[in-house]
A protein has these predicted regions:
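PRPP-associated nucleotide enzymes
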Residues: 1-201
Length: 201
């Protein structure tokens, strides 16, 4: 069920999984190790803004320590309704740098926080293939979390750690939570909770 509280929309009656900062960074390094142990050596790493960006940073750092240098960048996707107002279209921003740099013998890793519908990742890969043509590099996808029941594409992530159907609440996320949920599950903002409460109520 979705309810509105002032300017904010809050989902209730849905099981949430609160991810701690230390768990996410550990999973990011574990994800990088999984990619490395599989023998994949990306020389380009793309972090999908927002959630994939910090994970992408950790993956890039891990590879760097292991002696695998890579160029790295964050890109963004935006969802909007199509002409028929029934289908969701995806627009990708920030790929130009990669498109101009990559060659067919390069290896590219796309990093996101969660693979749910898969529509954004599918669009990113499609845009890369369309723009790069014969220079399209090998492309693989890595994410800590995968939601198979939500996947609307034929693609699954090449690398992932956890399968889940829960509502994932990442360390940086506050929007969509009630004050009570923030108070109970976000110790990082415990010193600010009273000020937050006065502002949004």
């Amino acid at each position: 069920m979705v309810i509105k509280t002032g300017k904010h929309i809050v989902c209730v009656d849905m099981e949430k999984h609160y991810i701690r900062s230390e768990d996410l960074i550990q999973d990011s390094f574990r994800l990088a190790l999984q990619v490395y142990e599989d023998g994949y050596r990306p020389n380009y790493i793309i972090g999908v803004w927002r959630g994939g960006a910090p994970i992408g940073i950790a993956v890039q750092e891990f590879f760097s320590v292991l002696g695998v240098p890579s160029d790295h960048i964050a890109i963004r996707t935006s969802h909007y309704k199509g002409i028929d107002d029934r289908s969701t279209e995806v627009q990708v921003f920030g790929l130009n740098y990669v498109i101009k740099q990559v060659e067919s013998d390069d290896s590219l890793l796309i990093v996101d926080d969660v693979h749910d519908t898969g529509i954004s990742i599918e669009k990113i890969v499609s845009d890369l293939q369309t723009a790069c043509k014969k220079n399209t590099p090998e492309i693989r996808v890595a994410t800590p979390y995968f939601k198979p029941s939500k996947n609307k594409t034929s693609r699954t992530p090449d690398y992932y750690l956890h399968e889940t159907d829960k509502w994932l609440v990442f360390p940086h996320e506050l929007d969509g939570l009630s004050i009570e949920e923030i108070r109970a599950n976000k110790p990082e903002v415990s010193d600010l909770i009273e000020k937050i409460t006065k502002i949004i109520r």
